[in-house]
Amino acid sequence: MNRAEWSLSEPGIDLIILGLGANDMLRGIQPDETERNLEEIIKIANSKKIKIIIAGMVAPTTHGTKYKKNFDAIYPKLSKKYNLPLIPFLLEGVALDPNLNQHDGIHPNKAGTIVISNTIQDIISKNY
């Protein structure tokens, strides 16, 4: 969180794509802590008049169904609370597709990043 204030103080930032959670989720950080961190970033960006798009993530069931339910609810909740555009799942259409991921099966390859970039561009075009 210390980096958020510093990073968002750079001149010329008009818009951020706010996506946080995959690594927090994989490390088992509780959804309420992830939500607080995201909300703090939203407040900092809003105070600087920076536009925001929320890039959602979904949790697998490896941490249990309660964790998944709570984690998956974070992004729509913040989008609604702050009236921000939402990409429900940033990796939609990319996750689990071997043609769109690196050999590790987790990280998008060049083709996968193009799909993600197009999704982001569509949201930007529709909202800003």
Report the location of each language-model feature:
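Alpha-helical cap/lid subdomain in secreted, periplasmic
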Residues: 1-128
